[in-house]
From Swiss-Prot:
The gene is NXT1. Stimulator of protein export for NES-containing proteins. Also plays a role in the nuclear export of U1 snRNA, tRNA, and mRNA. The NXF1-NXT1 heterodimer is involved in the export of HSP70 mRNA in conjunction with ALYREF/THOC4 and THOC5. Its main location: nucleus. It holds the Pfam family NTF2. GO terms for molecular function: small GTPase binding. This is NTF2-related export protein 1. Heterodimer with NXF1. Forms a complex with RANGAP1, RANBP2/NUP358 and NXF1. Interacts (via NTF2 domain) with NXF1. Stabilizes the NTF2 domain of NXF1 by heterodimerization. The formation of NXF1-NXT1 heterodimers is required for the NXF1-mediated nuclear mRNA export. Preferentially binds Ran-GTP. Associates with NXF2, NXF3 and NXF5. Does not bind nucleoporins (NPC) directly, its association to NPC is mediated by NXF1. PROSITE patterns: NTF2_DOMAIN. It comes from Homo sapiens. Signal peptide: none annotated. GO terms for biological process: mRNA export from nucleus; poly(A)+ mRNA export from nucleus; protein export from nucleus.
Length: 140
């Protein structure tokens, strides 16, 4: 990335992250059966240390989870430098918040996504390449 264009990359990353977070957590809470469509075919999810890869396995995993209600507190994002992902527009998105799964107490969580831009003739769609979810249990 040329330094003169860096602000453009940051603005693009922030817009993409904001749109993505709205779509992702609405889909997770209300249309979970569609959630795996947000992932690349080769994407990997690490959920509290347990890895799940591929859209079919992701779909099965998400369907197993109890219904949820996510509340987002913090969203941070940054473009990933071209040297790390040559010829691929990539964004790191970090989310902190709380979630209540049906039958469980509300818990804090941290989630990190690597998103990549998938261009088609009509538009650009951001897909999840990597997803890492962790419950945050604070020491007392």
């Amino acid at each position: 990335m040329a330094s003169v264009d860096f602000k453009t990359y940051v603005d693009q990353a922030c817009r993409a992250a904001e749109e993505f977070v709205n779509v992702y957590y609405t889909t997770m809470d209300k249309r979970r059966r569609l959630l795996s469509r947000l992932y690349m075919g080769t994407a990997t999810l690490v959920w509290n240390g347990n890895a799940v890869s591929g859209q079919e396995s992701l779909s099965e995993f998400f369907e197993m989870l109890p219904s949820s209600e996510f509340q987002i507190s913090v969203v941070d994002c940054q473009p990933v430098h071209d040297e790390a992902t040559p010829s691929q527009t990539t964004v790191l998105v970090v989310i902190c918040g709380s979630v209540k799964f049906e039958g469980n107490k509300q818990r804090d969580f941290n989630q990190n996504f690597i998103l990549t831009a998938q261009a088609s003739p009509s538009n650009t769609v951001w897909k999840i390449a990597s997803d890492c979810f962790r419950f945050q249990d604070w020491a007392s």
